[in-house]
Amino acid sequence: MRHRYRIAAVVGTAATVLGGLAAPASAYYGPEGCPPQYWRAHQGNWQEYRPDSRVSNAWHMTNLPLAERQLTFAQALADPGRTATTSRTLLRSAVASYLNAAHEGVLYPYRRFSAPYYLRISISDAIASGDTGYMREVIRDLDRANNLPCPLH
């Protein structure tokens, strides 16, 4: 069974739906995002979250290894390396997406807790699924948004 997507991306002025759930063009917030390495290096620019915030408080993740559940946001932003689990790589992308969506100065295309994007639900669903293919799709979409032009540089 294929998972339904709730994530969409904005490219230029046209909305591109990734995975099938469309929203009116007026609902898209903007084509900006900052990558994980930006957020790791500029912790003073974080809004609504702190470096010691735990990833386990942001997403339902009982099926993850204990070491991953105990990561702080700052730790999750570290490059996990080529041998990292898919879930660990997802946590890095997810933390960056939350920091982008929370920042008033970033016109990020996804929202954390509201329609039509529901980052929290999309990320929690991917983690809970245990399906590495599904997690990779979410990682790809989050990374695409996280690597849009960063207005905070």
Residue map of PLM features:
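Hydrophobic helical h-region of N-terminal Sec-dependent signal peptides
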Residues: 12-14
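Bacterial N-terminal signal peptides that target proteins for export
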Residues: 1-10
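Soluble extracellular-acting proteins and domains
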Residues: 28-153
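C-terminal segment of classical bacterial N-terminal signal peptides
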Residues: 17-25
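Extended, helix-rich scaffolding/adaptor regions
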Residues: 3-4, 25-27
